[in-house]
Amino acid sequence: MSSQIKPIKIYGQGGPNALKVALIFHELEIPYEIVVVPYADIKKAEYTAINPNGRVPAIHDPNTGITLWESGAIIEYLVDRYDSSHKLSFPLGSAEFYHSKQWLYFQTSGQGPYFGQVTWFKQLHHEQLPSAIERYVKEVNRVTAVLEEYLAKQKLASGSDEAWLVGNKISFADLSFLPWYTIMDFFLPSDQYNVKNYPHVKQWQDNMDSRKPVQDAKKVFKLGE
């Protein structure tokens, strides 16, 4: 990535969605700087002027003047703007172009909300609600089963251990799922969720975790501590 690119500001360093964006920064070697937003301040006027929804992350790109929030929208912007070689993306109009968006939207509408809710009801809610926990634990396993079945088909088709969601390479679609899976073991006991029950998902995660850009991003945007 050109050294002439000014660092993109990312607001927020904690949580899976900030890491989700950071993975793209590191994979594409996009310079960035972190603006720490304390949890107590995310609903204050200074930050809601940037993100009216009062959530992290958000970004401001001084190279284009664009400010964005919602991690999925940020990822689409970053690959559209900074991945002209299609390292993590696919040519406009190709089947893979649309399939990668399909999986990203499944992550943002399926995995993220359900995994977030199980985390809330397991760790943060003021009282234990077994029925709520049971529902979201089931959804965590259902979403993972969808990925397990699809990755098994991809592995069979590719004939290698590196099965990816789209085509024969890692893409932003794969990376978008990794942060929530990174912390599930911290929040759910093995009798509720165990990645070893999903061998293709585990291999997929291991393949992503073995990448240096992923390791570097996780050192900065730490989860589960």
Question: Positions of the model-derived regions?
Answer:
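Phosphate-coordinating loops and pocket residues in cytosolic domains that bind phosphorylated ligands
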Residues: 49, 210, 219
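GST-like domain detector, emphasizing the conserved glutathione-binding G-site
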Residues: 2-134
